[in-house]
Design a protein with these regions (language model features):
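Structured, helix-rich domain cores that form ligand/interaction pockets
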Residues: 1-292, 306, 310-378
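Helix-turn-helix DNA-binding segment
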Residues: 293-304
């Protein structure tokens, strides 16, 4: 049993036409931030619900934009969807993007690991192999520190090492994954009753230790491919606030960024057996990190090739073409910066929708544009 929740939600928004209503109080603070000149604490019926920072200091940022951070206790309330939509719509705050999102799952232990310390031991002794990034940080009781180029370990050696925290990714990573002992955090920092109440309502046993597996998404450098529609989805409020869509989103992050395998010594680690740590087997979404340059890595080529193979089977079975899907494939390859590769590999199989020919025509148009005189040439 695990409970999926939102633990951080910051919304990039247009507040240029903001008009606070009578039910909401926007209390302006006497200070701002390094990025925004103005800061407001927002209250609804006397309850503090959000912080709005706006009025960008830099001219490079769009005028009238800001960041709306929903306070942590609000994120665990039952009618979160209505609360956020009312806050934005009633006060004329327009959604632009999600600047930071932390999704978490709380549980008592991983499947197969009633003693969570055994999970840490199996990882550190390579009995479990994590697919993907190999740099990590492990923490236990803060007494002794050990550093090397690949990880930092903080712990106390007594009768055994007791680990409380494991992180993959850095503070600047577009996606970071954290596993930590939430019960220990309550002991060390502060107990949050509203989280404990959510546990009790969802059969999370607080008499045992409760662990949290959290994924933090920052900026707009990650998109999601809907594997049913083959369409791209950016992060949006429906995806986050609707419980069903939120679970699909979390499942996608778990399958991509918490992929552990039972190490049987195979050279190809991705062929080793999955370690089923949580009862999550599939998601209709697939996360893809956007680097900002032409993306030509092997994983994305494999994804496009898999789509092409599936489409071949559909065409053979139905003896007909799907122009909508073909257009989506074209859009996908352009989005990933793989038009030339796709045209060379698959262009010949399209009779009257020749991707190779289209790519060549686009190259010729770009060449013509490059030699056209500009205002500076005249």
């Amino acid at each position: 049993m695990h409970l999926v929740s939102i633990d951080w939600l910051s919304i990039y928004c247009d507040c240029s036409a903001m008009a606070p209503s009578k039910d909401y109080i926007f209390d302006k603070e006497p200070y701002g931030t390094s990025v925004f000149a103005d800061m407001y604490t927002i209250y609804l019926y006397g309850e503090e619900i959000a912080i709005l920072t706006c009025n960008p200091r830099s001219s490079a940022m769009k005028k009238g934009t800001g960041v709306l951070k929903i306070l942590n206790p609000i994120l665990y309330q039952q009618f979160l969807y209505e609360q956020i939509w009312n806050l934005m719509h009633i006060n004329n705050i327009q959604f632009l993007n999600i600047s930071r999102l932390d999704l978490c799952a709380d549980f008592n232990h991983f499947d197969g690991y009633p003693d969570m310390q055994q999970f840490f031991q199996d990882f550190l002794t390579l009995k479990l192999w994590k697919i993907g990034a190999a740099k990590y940080k492990v923490c236990a009781n803060k007494a002794v520190e050990f550093d090397c180029n690949y990880f930092k370990m903080i712990g106390l050696q007594s009768s055994r090492h007791t680990y409380q925290y494991l992180r993959f990714g850095s503070k600047v990573s577009k996606v970071s994954a954290y596993l930590y002992n939430k019960t220990q955090e309550f002991r060390d920092v502060k107990r949050k009753n509203y989280i404990a109440e959510a546990w009790a309502a969802n059969d999370i046993d607080e008499k045992q230790e409760v662990w949290r597996l959290e994924f933090s998404l920052k900026g707009d450098g990650i998109k999601f491919l809907n594997q049913e529609t083959k369409m791209w989805q950016a992060k949006n409020l429906d995806m986050v606030l609707d419980p069903i869509q939120r679970t699909q989103l979390y499942n996608a992050l778990y399958l991509k960024y918490w992929d552990f395998r039972v190490n049987d010594g195979q050279k190809r680690k991705d062929r080793m057996k999955h370690a089923a740590l949580l009862p999550i087997e599939s998601s209709i979404l697939r996360p893809v990190v956007i680097t900002g340059s032409d993306i030509t890595d092997r994983e994305q080529k494999r994804m496009i090739s898999a789509i092409e193979r599936t489409y071949d089977e559909v065409r053979m079975k139905r003896q007909t073409r799907n122009e909508t899907l073909e257009a989506s494939i074209q859009e996908l390859t352009a989005f990933c910066g793989l038009r030339k590769w796709h045209a060379e590999k698959y262009g010949a199989k399209y009779a009257d929708m020749d991707f190779a020919e289209q790519y060549q025509e686009e190259e010729e148009r770009r060449e013509i544009d490059r030699v056209q005189p500009t205002l500076f040439d005249q």
